[in-house]
């Protein structure tokens, strides 16, 4: 399994998951199409491995659990050479991001079913997170929206050539993704084919994942400052993805 679904197939599969005994006539009524049209979509779902037969017997879903940060990313891009201690002409752009969110998004584009587990606030940025997730097919069923909390933010300032001058993050809400937080979703995590984490998570949370998950754990470092959070669990990771600077910190070996 893992072949991508059309929007209509995804919609029909969702209804079947809610009621495996639903008839094709009822599905046709909900979709606003003919019963034969529904039959064709059901046939495609069977060919793609999502349904095993009439009834409907659903194939246990294979998926990846992605745990980490959702951010509102803000980028300041200088138009000319940067002058220190002064205002610089440039452009400012914003977009929903975060390492875990971006991994979830790209897995979806590759046709890999996944669930994102994260936290965000009830502020304006949090509403952007929700609308962006729905628009891009990111499943945030297991993301918690905290009241009276700010969504994680990341600010990057780059020069005219695209080289980063400084990056700042305000990710206090990610500290709420504790082992106790993840225990609410442990069945989702434990039944995943693989688990992906990023190093924005608290050290104790990373340790909990590596101690309790029996499937492969993949980790992505988010910054030099947070790379050290993965040091205690390196031996338990299946794969670690990091930059040159981050690799030097983790291994202690200079990269030339």
Task: Describe each PLM feature range.
Residues 68-72, 121, 223-225, 246:
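Glycine-rich beta-alpha junction loops
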Residues 194-256:
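Conserved beta-alpha-beta core of the PfkB/ribokinase-like small-molecule kinase fold
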